[in-house]
Protein backbone atom coordinates (compact mmCIF):
# COMPACT_ATOMS: atom_id res chain seq x y z
CA UNK A 1 0.00 0.00 0.00
CA UNK A 2 1.44 3.39 -1.03
CA UNK A 3 0.58 6.64 0.70
CA UNK A 4 1.28 9.96 -1.04
CA UNK A 5 1.47 13.19 0.87
CA UNK A 6 0.87 16.43 -1.01
CA UNK A 7 2.52 18.86 1.41
CA UNK A 8 5.91 17.11 1.64
CA UNK A 9 8.20 17.08 -1.38
CA UNK A 10 11.17 14.90 -2.19
CA UNK A 11 13.89 15.14 -4.84
CA UNK A 12 14.64 11.95 -6.77
CA UNK A 13 17.02 11.11 -9.58
CA UNK A 14 16.16 9.59 -12.95
CA UNK A 15 18.88 8.38 -15.35
CA UNK A 16 18.04 7.85 -19.03
CA UNK A 17 20.21 6.53 -21.86
CA UNK A 18 20.05 8.91 -24.82
CA UNK A 19 19.83 7.84 -28.47
CA UNK A 20 21.00 10.96 -30.37
CA UNK A 21 21.55 11.10 -34.12
CA UNK A 22 24.90 12.10 -35.65
CA UNK A 23 24.13 15.84 -35.74
CA UNK A 24 23.03 15.80 -32.09
CA UNK A 25 26.18 13.88 -31.11
CA UNK A 26 28.31 16.64 -32.61
CA UNK A 27 26.38 19.28 -30.65
CA UNK A 28 26.69 17.30 -27.41
CA UNK A 29 30.44 16.91 -27.93
CA UNK A 30 30.74 20.63 -28.69
CA UNK A 31 29.08 21.52 -25.37
CA UNK A 32 31.45 19.16 -23.57
CA UNK A 33 34.50 20.73 -25.23
CA UNK A 34 33.31 24.30 -24.58
CA UNK A 35 32.69 23.68 -20.88
CA UNK A 36 36.09 21.99 -20.63
CA UNK A 37 37.75 24.99 -22.31
CA UNK A 38 36.16 27.46 -19.86
CA UNK A 39 37.04 25.27 -16.89
CA UNK A 40 40.69 25.15 -17.98
CA UNK A 41 40.68 28.96 -18.31
CA UNK A 42 39.58 29.24 -14.67
CA UNK A 43 42.18 26.69 -13.54
CA UNK A 44 44.92 28.67 -15.31
CA UNK A 45 43.84 31.91 -13.61
CA UNK A 46 43.61 30.17 -10.22
CA UNK A 47 47.13 28.70 -10.45
CA UNK A 48 48.57 32.05 -11.63
CA UNK A 49 46.97 33.82 -8.66
CA UNK A 50 48.54 31.32 -6.23
CA UNK A 51 52.00 31.87 -7.73
CA UNK A 52 51.66 35.67 -7.67
CA UNK A 53 50.11 35.59 -4.16
CA UNK A 54 46.91 37.43 -5.10
CA UNK A 55 43.19 36.81 -5.36
CA UNK A 56 42.05 35.24 -8.66
CA UNK A 57 40.09 37.44 -11.06
CA UNK A 58 37.73 35.19 -13.00
CA UNK A 59 36.23 36.35 -16.27
CA UNK A 60 32.49 36.02 -16.73
CA UNK A 61 31.22 33.73 -19.49
CA UNK A 62 30.07 36.84 -21.42
CA UNK A 63 33.65 38.16 -21.56
CA UNK A 64 34.93 34.77 -22.68
CA UNK A 65 32.21 34.64 -25.34
CA UNK A 66 33.34 38.02 -26.66
CA UNK A 67 36.96 36.82 -26.87
CA UNK A 68 36.17 33.39 -28.38
CA UNK A 69 33.42 33.26 -31.00
CA UNK A 70 33.03 29.46 -30.96
CA UNK A 71 31.50 29.73 -27.46
CA UNK A 72 28.47 31.61 -28.81
CA UNK A 73 26.89 28.41 -30.14
CA UNK A 74 26.74 26.82 -26.67
CA UNK A 75 23.92 27.28 -24.18
CA UNK A 76 24.59 30.23 -21.85
CA UNK A 77 23.40 28.56 -18.63
CA UNK A 78 25.82 25.65 -19.02
CA UNK A 79 28.75 28.04 -19.44
CA UNK A 80 27.66 30.09 -16.43
CA UNK A 81 27.40 27.00 -14.23
CA UNK A 82 31.06 26.12 -14.87
CA UNK A 83 32.27 29.12 -12.83
CA UNK A 84 29.73 28.47 -10.07
CA UNK A 85 30.74 24.82 -9.71
CA UNK A 86 34.45 25.72 -9.89
CA UNK A 87 34.06 28.18 -6.99
CA UNK A 88 32.07 25.61 -5.01
CA UNK A 89 34.81 22.97 -5.36
CA UNK A 90 37.46 25.47 -4.22
CA UNK A 91 35.29 26.40 -1.24
CA UNK A 92 34.95 22.72 -0.24
CA UNK A 93 38.70 22.18 -0.65
CA UNK A 94 39.47 25.18 1.59
CA UNK A 95 37.20 23.84 4.32
CA UNK A 96 38.92 20.44 4.09
CA UNK A 97 42.37 22.05 4.37
CA UNK A 98 41.26 24.02 7.42
CA UNK A 99 40.30 20.71 9.07
CA UNK A 100 43.76 19.28 8.40
CA UNK A 101 42.89 17.05 5.43
CA UNK A 102 45.31 16.70 2.53
CA UNK A 103 43.76 18.15 -0.63
CA UNK A 104 45.65 18.79 -3.85
CA UNK A 105 45.29 21.72 -6.24
CA UNK A 106 42.78 21.72 -9.08
CA UNK A 107 44.02 20.21 -12.33
CA UNK A 108 43.40 20.82 -16.00
CA UNK A 109 40.83 18.59 -17.65
CA UNK A 110 41.58 16.62 -20.79
CA UNK A 111 39.14 15.30 -23.38
CA UNK A 112 39.28 11.86 -21.75
CA UNK A 113 38.58 12.98 -18.19
CA UNK A 114 35.94 15.65 -18.87
CA UNK A 115 32.66 13.85 -19.51
CA UNK A 116 29.69 15.89 -18.23
CA UNK A 117 28.05 19.30 -18.27
CA UNK A 118 25.19 20.85 -16.37
CA UNK A 119 21.76 22.37 -17.08
CA UNK A 120 19.64 24.27 -14.58
CA UNK A 121 16.43 24.94 -16.51
CA UNK A 122 14.46 24.59 -19.76
CA UNK A 123 14.80 20.77 -19.92
CA UNK A 124 11.53 18.97 -20.67
CA UNK A 125 10.64 15.27 -20.56
CA UNK A 126 7.98 13.89 -22.92
CA UNK A 127 6.98 10.24 -22.44
CA UNK A 128 4.34 8.53 -24.58
CA UNK A 129 2.99 5.31 -23.07
CA UNK A 130 1.21 4.22 -26.26
CA UNK A 131 4.08 4.87 -28.67
CA UNK A 132 7.43 4.81 -26.88
CA UNK A 133 9.30 5.73 -30.07
CA UNK A 134 7.79 9.23 -29.76
CA UNK A 135 9.26 9.74 -26.28
CA UNK A 136 12.04 12.32 -26.10
CA UNK A 137 13.92 14.76 -23.88
CA UNK A 138 14.10 18.38 -24.97
CA UNK A 139 17.60 19.81 -24.34
CA UNK A 140 18.29 23.48 -25.17
CA UNK A 141 20.53 24.05 -28.22
CA UNK A 142 20.34 20.28 -28.94
CA UNK A 143 16.64 19.72 -29.63
CA UNK A 144 14.41 16.71 -29.02
CA UNK A 145 16.65 13.73 -28.23
CA UNK A 146 15.22 10.21 -28.13
CA UNK A 147 16.09 7.98 -25.20
CA UNK A 148 16.11 4.26 -24.47
CA UNK A 149 12.56 3.66 -23.27
CA UNK A 150 11.82 1.92 -20.03
CA UNK A 151 8.85 1.92 -17.69
CA UNK A 152 9.04 5.35 -16.03
CA UNK A 153 7.02 5.84 -12.86
CA UNK A 154 4.14 8.29 -13.02
CA UNK A 155 5.60 10.32 -10.11
CA UNK A 156 8.52 11.35 -12.35
CA UNK A 157 6.22 12.41 -15.19
CA UNK A 158 4.11 14.57 -12.88
CA UNK A 159 7.12 16.05 -11.06
CA UNK A 160 9.09 19.22 -11.68
CA UNK A 161 12.60 18.98 -13.20
CA UNK A 162 15.05 20.97 -11.06
CA UNK A 163 18.45 20.27 -12.64
CA UNK A 164 19.91 18.10 -15.37
CA UNK A 165 23.36 16.66 -16.13
CA UNK A 166 24.36 15.26 -19.52
CA UNK A 167 27.20 12.75 -19.39
CA UNK A 168 29.25 10.82 -21.94
CA UNK A 169 30.54 7.51 -20.59
CA UNK A 170 33.91 5.98 -21.46
CA UNK A 171 32.17 3.64 -23.88
CA UNK A 172 30.76 6.58 -25.87
CA UNK A 173 27.18 6.28 -24.55
CA UNK A 174 25.32 9.50 -23.70
CA UNK A 175 23.25 9.57 -20.51
CA UNK A 176 21.11 12.23 -18.89
CA UNK A 177 20.43 12.37 -15.15
CA UNK A 178 17.44 14.42 -14.01
CA UNK A 179 16.72 15.66 -10.50
CA UNK A 180 12.93 15.77 -10.21
CA UNK A 181 10.84 17.17 -7.35
CA UNK A 182 8.07 14.68 -6.55
CA UNK A 183 5.58 14.07 -3.76
CA UNK A 184 6.83 11.85 -0.94
CA UNK A 185 5.59 8.27 -1.25
CA UNK A 186 5.49 5.99 1.80
CA UNK A 187 5.08 2.21 1.75
CA UNK A 188 3.97 -0.31 4.35
CA UNK A 189 6.33 -2.94 5.80
CA UNK A 190 5.59 -6.66 5.48
CA UNK A 191 7.15 -7.66 8.85
CA UNK A 192 8.33 -5.80 11.97
CA UNK A 193 11.43 -7.85 12.79
CA UNK A 194 14.59 -6.54 14.47
CA UNK A 195 17.91 -7.38 12.83
CA UNK A 196 21.60 -6.72 13.45
CA UNK A 197 24.14 -6.67 10.61
CA UNK A 198 27.88 -7.25 10.89
CA UNK A 199 29.80 -6.53 7.68
CA UNK A 200 32.07 -9.22 6.26
CA UNK A 201 34.52 -9.17 3.36
CA UNK A 202 33.55 -12.67 2.29
CA UNK A 203 29.75 -12.67 2.79
CA UNK A 204 28.95 -8.91 2.58
CA UNK A 205 27.21 -9.21 5.97
CA UNK A 206 26.08 -11.75 8.57
CA UNK A 207 22.81 -10.97 10.37
CA UNK A 208 21.65 -11.71 13.92
CA UNK A 209 19.70 -14.77 12.68
CA UNK A 210 22.93 -16.39 11.45
CA UNK A 211 22.09 -15.89 7.77
CA UNK A 212 24.43 -14.38 5.19
CA UNK A 213 23.60 -11.86 2.49
CA UNK A 214 21.27 -13.66 0.04
CA UNK A 215 22.70 -14.62 -3.37
CA UNK A 216 25.96 -12.78 -2.67
CA UNK A 217 28.14 -15.79 -3.57
CA UNK A 218 26.71 -15.91 -7.12
CA UNK A 219 27.15 -12.15 -7.52
CA UNK A 220 30.71 -12.37 -6.25
CA UNK A 221 31.60 -15.19 -8.68
CA UNK A 222 30.16 -13.10 -11.53
CA UNK A 223 32.21 -10.07 -10.46
CA UNK A 224 35.37 -12.19 -10.19
CA UNK A 225 34.86 -13.55 -13.73
CA UNK A 226 34.48 -9.98 -15.02
CA UNK A 227 37.60 -8.95 -13.10
CA UNK A 228 39.66 -11.72 -14.72
CA UNK A 229 38.61 -10.53 -18.18
CA UNK A 230 39.46 -6.93 -17.24
CA UNK A 231 42.92 -7.96 -16.00
CA UNK A 232 43.66 -9.87 -19.20
CA UNK A 233 42.59 -6.88 -21.31
CA UNK A 234 44.77 -4.56 -19.21
CA UNK A 235 47.82 -6.75 -19.87
CA UNK A 236 47.08 -6.74 -23.61
CA UNK A 237 46.73 -2.94 -23.67
CA UNK A 238 49.98 -2.44 -21.75
CA UNK A 239 51.84 -4.75 -24.18
CA UNK A 240 50.45 -2.83 -27.14
CA UNK A 241 51.72 0.43 -25.66
CA UNK A 242 55.23 -0.93 -25.10
CA UNK A 243 55.62 -2.82 -28.40
CA UNK A 244 54.30 -0.33 -30.93
CA UNK A 245 56.03 -0.73 -34.33
CA UNK A 246 53.10 0.28 -36.52
CA UNK A 247 51.51 2.98 -34.36
CA UNK A 248 48.45 3.49 -36.55
CA UNK A 249 47.46 -0.19 -36.54
CA UNK A 250 48.18 -0.51 -32.82
CA UNK A 251 46.12 2.57 -31.95
CA UNK A 252 43.03 1.09 -33.65
CA UNK A 253 43.47 -2.20 -31.78
CA UNK A 254 44.06 -0.38 -28.50
CA UNK A 255 40.92 1.68 -28.98
CA UNK A 256 38.83 -1.45 -29.52
CA UNK A 257 40.35 -3.17 -26.48
CA UNK A 258 39.84 -0.13 -24.24
CA UNK A 259 36.18 0.14 -25.31
CA UNK A 260 35.73 -3.55 -24.53
CA UNK A 261 37.38 -3.10 -21.12
CA UNK A 262 35.28 -0.03 -20.29
CA UNK A 263 32.10 -1.96 -21.13
CA UNK A 264 33.15 -4.64 -18.64
CA UNK A 265 33.73 -1.94 -16.01
CA UNK A 266 30.20 -0.67 -16.60
CA UNK A 267 28.77 -4.19 -16.30
CA UNK A 268 30.57 -4.66 -12.97
CA UNK A 269 29.15 -1.36 -11.74
CA UNK A 270 25.62 -2.25 -12.89
CA UNK A 271 25.73 -5.67 -11.17
CA UNK A 272 26.83 -4.06 -7.89
CA UNK A 273 24.22 -1.28 -7.98
CA UNK A 274 21.37 -3.61 -8.92
CA UNK A 275 22.19 -6.05 -6.11
CA UNK A 276 22.51 -3.33 -3.45
CA UNK A 277 19.25 -1.63 -4.49
CA UNK A 278 17.29 -4.88 -4.18
CA UNK A 279 19.00 -5.95 -0.94
CA UNK A 280 18.48 -2.62 0.87
CA UNK A 281 14.82 -2.52 -0.13
CA UNK A 282 14.28 -6.11 1.07
CA UNK A 283 15.85 -5.38 4.47
CA UNK A 284 13.74 -2.26 5.05
CA UNK A 285 10.56 -3.98 3.88
CA UNK A 286 10.88 -6.92 6.32
CA UNK A 287 12.48 -5.25 9.39
CA UNK A 288 11.51 -2.42 11.69
CA UNK A 289 14.86 -1.96 13.50
CA UNK A 290 18.23 -2.35 11.75
CA UNK A 291 21.42 -2.26 13.85
CA UNK A 292 24.77 -1.53 12.20
CA UNK A 293 28.32 -0.80 13.21
CA UNK A 294 29.67 2.65 12.38
CA UNK A 295 32.69 1.80 10.22
CA UNK A 296 35.42 4.17 9.07
CA UNK A 297 35.61 2.85 5.51
CA UNK A 298 38.36 5.28 4.43
CA UNK A 299 40.62 4.09 7.25
CA UNK A 300 39.84 0.42 6.54
CA UNK A 301 40.73 0.75 2.86
CA UNK A 302 44.10 2.36 3.70
CA UNK A 303 45.17 -0.24 6.28
CA UNK A 304 48.04 -2.43 5.08
CA UNK A 305 48.64 -4.49 8.24
CA UNK A 306 45.24 -6.17 8.15
CA UNK A 307 45.70 -9.95 8.14
CA UNK A 308 42.35 -11.57 7.39
CA UNK A 309 41.99 -15.27 6.53
CA UNK A 310 38.67 -14.53 4.81
CA UNK A 311 40.52 -13.19 1.78
CA UNK A 312 43.29 -14.69 -0.30
CA UNK A 313 45.77 -11.82 0.18
CA UNK A 314 47.57 -11.53 3.51
CA UNK A 315 48.89 -8.28 4.87
CA UNK A 316 47.88 -6.39 1.73
CA UNK A 317 45.74 -3.36 1.10
CA UNK A 318 42.02 -4.24 1.09
CA UNK A 319 40.90 -1.02 -0.57
CA UNK A 320 40.00 -2.82 -3.80
CA UNK A 321 37.87 -5.49 -2.11
CA UNK A 322 36.12 -2.88 0.07
CA UNK A 323 35.48 -0.76 -3.01
CA UNK A 324 33.94 -3.75 -4.82
CA UNK A 325 31.52 -4.33 -1.95
CA UNK A 326 30.41 -0.66 -1.97
CA UNK A 327 29.33 -0.55 1.67
CA UNK A 328 29.00 3.25 1.66
CA UNK A 329 26.49 3.11 -1.22
CA UNK A 330 24.64 0.33 0.61
CA UNK A 331 24.30 2.51 3.73
CA UNK A 332 23.01 5.45 1.68
CA UNK A 333 20.37 3.30 -0.03
CA UNK A 334 19.43 1.77 3.33
CA UNK A 335 18.71 5.24 4.75
CA UNK A 336 16.68 6.22 1.67
CA UNK A 337 14.52 3.09 1.87
CA UNK A 338 14.22 3.48 5.66
CA UNK A 339 12.63 6.89 5.12
CA UNK A 340 10.17 5.30 2.69
CA UNK A 341 9.23 2.32 4.91
CA UNK A 342 9.55 4.08 8.29
CA UNK A 343 12.44 2.07 9.77
CA UNK A 344 14.76 2.79 12.69
CA UNK A 345 18.50 2.56 11.91
CA UNK A 346 21.01 2.53 14.78
CA UNK A 347 24.72 3.05 14.10
CA UNK A 348 26.63 1.62 17.06
CA UNK A 349 29.93 3.15 18.16
CA UNK A 350 32.88 1.54 16.36
CA UNK A 351 34.73 1.04 19.68
CA UNK A 352 31.90 -1.12 21.05
CA UNK A 353 33.47 -4.64 21.49
CA UNK A 354 30.69 -6.53 19.74
CA UNK A 355 32.96 -9.38 18.64
CA UNK A 356 34.64 -9.77 22.07
CA UNK A 357 31.51 -10.16 24.24
CA UNK A 358 29.84 -13.57 24.44
CA UNK A 359 26.24 -13.16 23.32
CA UNK A 360 25.07 -15.86 25.76
CA UNK A 361 26.73 -15.05 29.11
CA UNK A 362 28.34 -11.64 28.52
CA UNK A 363 31.93 -12.60 29.33
CA UNK A 364 34.52 -10.55 27.48
CA UNK A 365 37.27 -12.33 25.52
CA UNK A 366 40.29 -10.13 24.82
CA UNK A 367 41.82 -12.76 22.52
CA UNK A 368 39.10 -11.94 19.95
CA UNK A 369 40.90 -8.66 19.22
CA UNK A 370 42.99 -10.73 16.82
CA UNK A 371 41.04 -10.84 13.56
CA UNK A 372 42.42 -14.28 12.69
CA UNK A 373 40.26 -15.85 15.45
CA UNK A 374 37.04 -16.60 13.59
CA UNK A 375 35.18 -18.56 16.29
CA UNK A 376 34.46 -17.57 19.89
CA UNK A 377 34.67 -20.40 22.45
CA UNK A 378 33.28 -19.42 25.86
CA UNK A 379 33.35 -21.28 29.21
CA UNK A 380 29.54 -21.33 29.22
CA UNK A 381 29.65 -23.73 26.26
CA UNK A 382 28.80 -21.17 23.62
CA UNK A 383 30.78 -21.87 20.42
CA UNK A 384 29.75 -19.32 17.83
CA UNK A 385 31.04 -17.65 14.68
CA UNK A 386 32.70 -14.28 15.18
CA UNK A 387 30.46 -12.31 12.80
CA UNK A 388 27.25 -14.02 14.01
CA UNK A 389 28.14 -13.21 17.63
CA UNK A 390 28.90 -9.59 16.73
CA UNK A 391 25.56 -9.17 14.92
CA UNK A 392 23.64 -10.45 17.97
CA UNK A 393 25.46 -8.02 20.30
CA UNK A 394 24.83 -5.10 17.94
CA UNK A 395 21.12 -5.90 17.91
CA UNK A 396 20.96 -6.19 21.72
CA UNK A 397 22.75 -2.88 22.19
CA UNK A 398 20.47 -1.08 19.72
CA UNK A 399 17.35 -2.49 21.41
CA UNK A 400 18.74 -1.20 24.71
CA UNK A 401 19.18 2.28 23.18
CA UNK A 402 15.79 2.47 21.42
CA UNK A 403 13.43 0.41 23.62
CA UNK A 404 15.35 0.46 26.97
CA UNK A 405 15.49 -3.34 27.02
CA UNK A 406 17.79 -4.68 29.74
CA UNK A 407 20.22 -7.48 28.88
CA UNK A 408 22.33 -9.08 31.61
CA UNK A 409 24.93 -10.09 29.03
CA UNK A 410 25.68 -6.43 28.21
CA UNK A 411 25.23 -4.74 31.60
CA UNK A 412 28.93 -5.03 32.55
CA UNK A 413 30.31 -2.50 30.06
CA UNK A 414 27.20 -0.98 28.57
CA UNK A 415 27.52 2.45 30.20
CA UNK A 416 30.95 3.05 28.62
CA UNK A 417 29.62 3.09 25.05
CA UNK A 418 26.93 4.96 23.22
CA UNK A 419 25.11 4.77 19.91
CA UNK A 420 26.91 6.84 17.29
CA UNK A 421 23.76 7.80 15.41
CA UNK A 422 20.12 6.78 15.61
CA UNK A 423 17.89 7.56 12.62
CA UNK A 424 14.19 7.21 13.46
CA UNK A 425 12.00 7.25 10.35
CA UNK A 426 8.96 5.67 12.06
CA UNK A 427 5.63 7.30 11.20
CA UNK A 428 3.39 6.13 14.04
CA UNK A 429 1.97 9.64 14.64
CA UNK A 430 1.66 10.55 10.99
CA UNK A 431 -0.29 7.40 10.08
CA UNK A 432 -3.01 8.26 12.63
CA UNK A 433 -3.82 11.41 10.64
CA UNK A 434 -3.87 9.74 7.23
CA UNK A 435 -7.67 10.02 6.91
CA UNK A 436 -7.43 13.82 7.28
CA UNK A 437 -4.41 14.94 5.25
CA UNK A 438 -3.25 11.87 3.29
CA UNK A 439 -4.59 10.78 -0.08
What are these regions (language model features)?
Residues 58-169, 324:
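Acidic carboxylate diad motif detector
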Residues 43-50, 90, 94-101, 294:
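Long, hydrophobic, amphipathic alpha-helical segments used as structural scaffolds
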Residues 25, 36, 40-43, 54-61, ...:
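Alpha-helix initiation and N-capping motif
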Residues 14-18, 145-150, 213-216:
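Generic detection of short hydrophobic beta-strand segments and adjacent strand-loop junctions
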Residues 4, 12, 170-439:
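Positively charged, helix-rich recognition surfaces that bind polyanionic ligands
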Residues 1-81:
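Gly/serine-rich nucleotide phosphate-binding loop at the start of the catalytic core
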Amino acid sequence: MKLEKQSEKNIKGLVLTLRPDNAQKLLLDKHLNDTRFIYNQYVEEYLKAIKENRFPEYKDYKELRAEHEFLKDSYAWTLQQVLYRFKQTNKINRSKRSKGQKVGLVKFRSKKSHSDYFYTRAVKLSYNLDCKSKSYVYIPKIGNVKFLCKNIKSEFLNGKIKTCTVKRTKTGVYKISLLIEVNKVYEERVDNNHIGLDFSLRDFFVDSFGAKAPEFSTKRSKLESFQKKIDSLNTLISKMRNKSKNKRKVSVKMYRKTIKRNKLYERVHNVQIDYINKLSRYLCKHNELIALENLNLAEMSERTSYNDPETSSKGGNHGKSIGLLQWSYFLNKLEQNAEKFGNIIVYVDKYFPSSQICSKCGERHSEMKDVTNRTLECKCGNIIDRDYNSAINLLKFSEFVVYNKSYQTLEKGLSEYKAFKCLDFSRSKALKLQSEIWL
